[in-house]
Amino acid sequence: MEDQYVNEQGQKLLEKLKREGILPSPYNFANYKAPSLDEYIVHDSTLREGEQTPGVIFSIDDKLKIARKLDAVGVPQIEAGFPAASEKQRKCVEALVDMNLDAQLSAFARAKKEDIDVVADSGADGIVLSLSISPYHREYKFKGMSKETYLETLEEHISYAESYGLYIIYSAEDTTRENDLDFLKKAYKTAEEAGADRARVVDTLGCASPNGMAYLVKEIGKELEIPIEVHCHNDLGLALANSLASVEAGASTVSTSVNGLGERAGIAMTEEIIPALHMLYGTSIFEMNQLTSLSNLVQEISGIRMPPHKPLTGDNVNAHSSGIHQHGVLVNPTTYEFYPPRMMGQKRKIYIDELGGRHGIIYVAKELGIEISDETARKVLEKVKASFSSGERRSSYTPDEIKQLIDEIEKC
């Protein structure tokens, strides 16, 4: 049936995913064309963008812990910080360089020679050279900078960074609000000709749509030989969708942060982009079973807690509360799980509350090492439902509480 709309390339990927126990919608692979992804497919910015989250300040030791975990996941490129911002930032980047991680380290800089000098002196492999491009920034932040002056400034500073032998990522802040497409193309081409190794398209205010990002990436890509990276903010809740639309349009790298930490609503989440790239495009370079613990580590260090229903790494993502769902998933997990929980370093959870059923209670008992009859399970369920109906209870039963109910019933 699938061969009616899934082409040969899509069939191969779908079969590969099925062998891994991943059963996504086959319609994902209709007219499938594999995107051109870079060796630096994920460029994690937790240590730079993430620290711009209001109230979040990482110590040097915090950053080393996060970087070590990112490296264990297999993230190929880490944006280590903004070394020109302070002495502490500089020392942190230097300490990260001294770790000799497998990941390539980049550091952020403005289009200022003194910023570029600090990045070069830090020992970082690469530089994210930022120069805001939209008319709002050129008019108000740069006091009426003309397009001609912008291009001259850009060429001068890319060339200066290139003289240090740095891997250069030109980051055009507020790309998506520059309404002169010809000027945008000219800026990226100028950066490429001056020595940039990658072009970063930036949705600084998270105001673009997937269609808008895809169009922009395609148009800019027509002019360039160098790869494109996208940095998508989440103000409209579209950072993940915009990033994936950009990948399908030709972007080869996605800028992310763990738990989406960053300015305002943050950016695309590392722990969501990685499994999405795997389950939609077959990217297999990451240790995905480390992603839940990565998310938990950054929650602990940052103090920013994620909701339990957070996709892929939340506490409830592999939890089943409804009796209908519990029965289905216990008969065959594929009924209500399209990927195995272990893939994300998680375990299946069965919650017992007023929506639960006998099969869930039997499962919880078995997990406790107790074999119970259907009749005992039915009586436990009656007690559970009665406690919710009376208003006595408003939270799920823990396994220990279920054991206590079983003991009470079996004593009778």
Model-assigned labels for residue ranges:
Residues 42-45, 76-80, 103-109, 127-129, ...:
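Hydrophobic faces of well-ordered beta-strands that scaffold small-molecule active sites
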Residues 48, 83-85, 108-112, 132-134, ...:
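Active-site beta-loop-alpha junctions enriched in small/polar residues
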Residues 71-76, 98-101, 159-166, 189-197, ...:
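Generic secondary-structure signature for well-ordered alpha-helical cores
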Residues 2-46, 281-412:
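A mid-to-C-terminal "edge-of-domain" accessory segment
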Residues 2-113, 352, 356, 364:
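N-terminal capping/small domains of soluble enzymes
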Residues 85-107, 112-123, 144-149, 179-187, ...:
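Active-site loop-helix segments enriched in His/Asp/Glu that coordinate
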Residues 205-208, 212-335:
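Catalytic alpha/beta core domains of metabolic enzymes, predominantly
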Residues 52-77, 98, 113-226, 244-249:
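Alpha/beta enzyme core
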